[in-house]
Amino acid sequence: NHPDGYDVYWAEYNKWELWMNSESGKTINPKTMRGPFCESADVPDTAYDDGKLAERAIRDLRRMKEMNKPFFLACGFWKPHLPFNAPKKYWDLYKREEIPLAPNRFRPEGLPEQVRNSSEIYAYARVTDTSDADFQREVKHGYYACLSYVDAQIGKVLDALDELGLAENTIVVLLGDHGWNLGEHDFVG
């Protein structure tokens, strides 16, 4: 342990390929070894990594409370990054047919084709035409489900802070790394 380092670090070893694939274990794109870009499996929150991370964070909060000294806890929730895999109950919060399409689904003039096809989503199975309205609704549905899923996981950690009596003396910072195009300018990614 380096004095300026972490006392504890948690990540599941060598799980990148498993994370990229679906709960069902289907790998469909042989070039990238990635499964579908979205999945609505009827599984508990802990079937996916963000649910496991929330549970781990709560265990760590309990442990750190007992230490009775200042602590730092970073939780790197992954959602809403691809793949848009979330438990079915979060997909069920939204009706796909009621999800609006982007109002500006046109391509910008002069956009080179290689830019249009550079999106990460093409690495996943079943992705051929991101301009299709049904596809864009499916992508938005998955994005909404993943937002609700990660919101629930963050809520569990915040609830634990309250239950443990730590909330009043804890600073919580939420950061995001980027947004998404969900059909705007005929682009998904």
Q: What are the functions of these language-model segments?
A:
Residues 1:
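His/Cys-centered metal/cofactor-coordination and adjacent catalytic loops
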Residues 9-55, 59-70, 74-189:
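Active-site-proximal cap/lid insertion segments
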